[in-house]
Amino acid sequence: MKKLILLAMLCVPGIALSSTKEALDYCATTESWAAQKVIDAAFERNKQLDRMKATSSLIERHKLVKGKKPITFEDWGQLYTQTIEISIPYIDNHKKPVIFIASSIISAEECSLTEVAYFDITPENN
């Protein structure tokens, strides 16, 4: 019985860490709030973009710390800064996709703690 309890205690933290990573990873997908804000704004400016084929990838994610203490929010836990790249192709595929870099503060509980900051890094626009 003691072995079973010990095994359960060792497995539970792994499950919690796994679900935290999955929740944070969701914040980097095209379905996330930050990506949708960027995709919606880009589509409003240019209706030739194919918003359904947009892609998003994680560039960087860091825990927020002050000194050596993690910065946490009572309701949402550990806070992170996250930067993602969002690529939105054109419907006709004759032009290169529009590419954005977007950054926001997130937690495993909430992908929309701050307004997303983003800018266009499409090579022809630089």
Identify the role of each PLM range.
Residues 1-4:
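Positively charged n-region of N-terminal signal peptides that target proteins for export
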Residues 39-95:
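Mature extracytoplasmic domains of secretory-pathway proteins
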Residues 10, 26, 73, 93, ...:
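Short linear sequence motifs
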Residues 25-29, 84, 113-119:
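Charged, low-complexity, helix/coiled-coil-prone segments
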Residues 101-126:
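A short, surface-exposed interaction/processing loop segment used at functional sites
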Residues 7-8, 13-60:
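N-terminal trafficking/processing presequences and adjacent post-cleavage segments
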Residues 6-7, 76:
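Short amphipathic alpha-helical "recognition" segments used for binding
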